[in-house]
Regions:
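Conserved alpha/beta-hydrolase
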Residues: 117-137
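Primarily recognizes the serine-hydrolase "nucleophile elbow" in alpha/beta-hydrolase
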Residues: 157-216
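N-terminal cap/lid segment of alpha/beta-hydrolase-fold proteins
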Residues: 45-94
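Short beta-strand/loop motif that positions the catalytic acidic residue
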Residues: 256, 262-264, 268
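Alpha/beta-hydrolase active-site loop
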Residues: 141-162
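The serine-hydrolase catalytic nucleophile loop
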Residues: 106-117, 132, 274
Length: 419
């Protein structure tokens, strides 16, 4: 009896250990094998001064000219007409440099960017702000190639304006709009310069994993929660039409072969403010472009002088428009990488807390649908197991009951048989 008991106990222990190992391995394989990590390769700031000055070019500065606004209509080519606002310097000798504005996710109207566009026009730069189409633009779906085509039509209109030098016409883009901008630069060779402000730089889910980590950390979430929230970004959201999570930023980033100005606000926790600038510099250098300037301003994601995201009525960060104008006028006057009197990287000291991971592959649970299915299946399986257990118990009880009745009937039959 003791031997049987020991064997049974040993068998149960071995089975339990094997099942624990199997389920632990399965759980490990289900989870993504990466974590967001603190960012440690900090960028070197040469000066706290955000001023940008060409060493040899004589350029106009902000406020030099009065400005004039003209309302335009831009045809997208598929029957839609978009409003646009053109701002020009009055009395500036032509042909002039010009800049097309590309919206990020928080703006879409022709009236947006008004303070920046008007300031640039007062420094002799013609600016055009077209509206962005919002049809078929949702939290889940964004058609970046379509936007690039439409902004390309606006660029053609700007380049064709009297008083504009098409060879000195470039683009200004913010946030999500910088992805659109790089698609545009990959399709066209006639873009004279690119200003990229608050750029995600990395692929969608890489940047979003970093941003989620920063947000949850700021909210005071425990470290395991911070890690697991970031890992949700590794799931496949395509069934929910969240295709922009897989936007291939690397594919287009290499097209930045023209002079580039990179701007970030040091209060911006949603963007890779150090890693992104370093990535743009490195990628541009590989393409033979060393004329990349980086500036950090004491501002938020919208380059406003405050920490609130989308807080209305905040003024622009100090020195922001002056830096834009001096840089655009400098590069369009022919200033090369070695022609600046000011450092390549300067401004307020940034601090990027988390790195944008470049490895965001999922585990066995590769999609939100599978995860949702498992979450639903768990309780369902428990209920089914309970029902099965009850059924087996009832079945066993019935078997015992029937066996007992047969036994009683047999005994009675034996006693009833004559000897």
């Amino acid at each position: 009896m003791k031997r049987i008991s020991v064997r049974r106990v040993a068998s149960v222990i071995v089975t339990a250990m094997a099942m624990t190992l199997v389920f632990a391995t399965l759980g490990w394989a289900m989870m993504p094998q990466w974590n967001t990590r603190p960012y440690t390769k900090h960028i070197v700031i040469a000066s706290a001064d955000t001023t940008i000055t060409p060493a040899h070019a004589n350029i106009p500065h902000e406020g030099r000219y009065r400005t004039r606004e003209t309302r335009l209509s831009i045809k997208t080519g598929d029957g839609v007409t978009l409003p646009a606002v053109l701002r020009e310097p009055v009395g500036a000798p032509g042909p002039r440099p010009a800049c097309l504005f590309i919206h990020g996710s928080g703006t879409s109207g022709a009236e947006d960017f008004g303070d920046i566009a008007n300031a640039m026009a007062s420094a002799g730069i013609v600016t055009l702000v077209p509206a962005k189409r919002n049809d078929n633009y949702t939290v889940l779906h964004r058609d970046y190639p379509r936007f690039a085509r439409e902004y390309g039509r606006s660029l053609d209109v700007l380049r064709g304006r009297i008083g504009v030098d098409p060879a000195k016409t470039g683009i200004y883009a913010e946030s999500e709009g910088t992805w659109i901008a790089t698609i545009l630069t990959s399709k066209r060779q006639d873009i004279a310069f690119a200003v990229l402000t608050s750029a995600p730089v990395f692929n969608g889910r890489e940047q979003m994993a970093m941003a989620v980590s920063a947000y949850t950390h700021e909210a005071g979430a425990p470290k395991p929660v911070v890690k697991d929230m970031a890992k949700l970004m590794s799931l496949d959201y395509a069934p929910f039409d969240l295709a922009y999570a897989d936007f291939d930023a690397d594919r287009y980033l290499k097209s930045l072969t023209m002079p580039v100005l990179v701007n970030y606000g040091t209060y911006d926790t949603a963007m890779p403010i150090e890693q992104g600038a370093q990535r743009i510099i490195a990628t541009a250098n590989k393409s033979g472009n060393e004329n990349v300037t980086v500036r950090y301003f004491a501002g938020n994601h919208q380059m406003r002088a405050g920490e609130g995201l989308f807080t209305p009525n905040l003024p622009l960060a100090e020195g922001y428009t002056q830096a834009l104008e001096n840089w655009v006028n400098g590069v369009t006057a022919g200033t090369k990488a070695d022609g600046w009197a000011t450092p390549q990287v300067a401004g307020a000291t940034p601090h990027q807390r988390f790195a944008a991971s470049q490895r965001t592959r999922s585990g066995i649970v590769g999609s939100l649908g599978v995860l949702a299915g498992l979450m639903v299946a768990g309780p369902v399986l428990i209920v089914m197991a309970a029902i099965l257990g009850i059924g087996l118990t009832v079945f066993s009880w019935l078997q015992t009951l029937l066996a007992g009745r047969r036994s009683v009937a047999t005994v009675r039959a034996v006693h009833a048989t004559p000897s």
